[in-house]
Amino acid sequence: MPPIKENVIIYANPDHCLSCHSCELACAVAHSGGHDMIEAIAANLPLHARNKVVSVDGTAMPMQCRQCEDAPCTFACPTGACRQADGQVQIVEQHCIGCKLCVMVCPFGAITVRSETVVEQGACTNRGVAKKCDLCVDWRASTGKTAPACVEACPTKAIRMVDLDAYRIALREARAREIAKSHRHMRVQF
């Protein structure tokens, strides 16, 4: 399994998003149980993305779990199914009771509860299980990829997996360039 680096996030640039939904399809297929897209469709498997392209005021923005440092879902979960580990928010599905508290407190609307059929001791029941972006940890381990499926599928590279510290440095440098550029024409002496 590729090592999970602490403070890794999915960065989405709305200026490059075409709203093609390739990231959603790739996510759904990556979580279809080891199938590729053709197999998943041919087997009529339910495909559920853990991300969503949201269009607001003519701008498309890929949205998914932000892997919050102080994630409200981890505090709201009564069973501890939502937890912080390895620099990300994880859901231990076996402990999830489908109460939807995590859905209600997520500030990004990044968690959904899906009904799953469970067969135990010959009995078939449905139960709700919380689902969210898991940075494709299992998919990356099985495919040898270093980036999540949504990142791999984006034709414009609007979605990238970035180290938060590197992002902060790049943001700081970009803002410094903007400030320096705006001050070039100002000649103020102190």
UniProtKB/Swiss-Prot annotation:
MF (Gene Ontology): 4 iron, 4 sulfur cluster binding; electron transfer activity; metal ion binding
Binding site for [4Fe-4S] cluster 4: 77, 96, 99, 102
Gene3D superfamilies cross-referenced by the UniProt entry: 3.30.70.20
Residues the entry annotates as binding [4Fe-4S] cluster 3: 65, 68, 73, 106
SUPFAM superfamilies on file: 4Fe-4S ferredoxins (SSF54862)
All residue ranges annotated as the 4Fe-4S ferredoxin-type domain in the record: 8-36, 87-116, 133-164
UniProt cross-references to InterPro entries, sorted A to Z: 4Fe4S_Fe-S-bd, 4Fe4S_Fe_S_CS, ET_IronSulfur_Cluster-Binding
Coiled coil: none
Entry keyword set: 4Fe-4S, Electron transport, Iron, Iron-sulfur, Metal-binding, Repeat, Transport
Binding site for [4Fe-4S] cluster 1: 17, 20, 23, 154
Highest taxon listed in the record's lineage: Bacteria
Binding site for [4Fe-4S] cluster 2: 27, 133, 136, 150
Function summary: The carbon monoxide dehydrogenase (CODH) oxidizes carbon monoxide coupled, via CooF, to the reduction of a hydrogen cation by a hydrogenase (probably CooH). CooF is required in stoichiometric amounts in vitro for anchoring CODH to the membrane as well as for conveying the electrons to the hydrogenase.
PANTHER family (alphabetical): ANAEROBIC DIMETHYL SULFOXIDE REDUCTASE CHAIN B-RELATED (PTHR43177:SF5), PROTEIN NRFC (PTHR43177)
Protein name: Iron-sulfur protein
Organism: Rhodospirillum rubrum
Lineage of producing organism: Bacteria, Pseudomonadati, Pseudomonadota, Alphaproteobacteria, Rhodospirillales
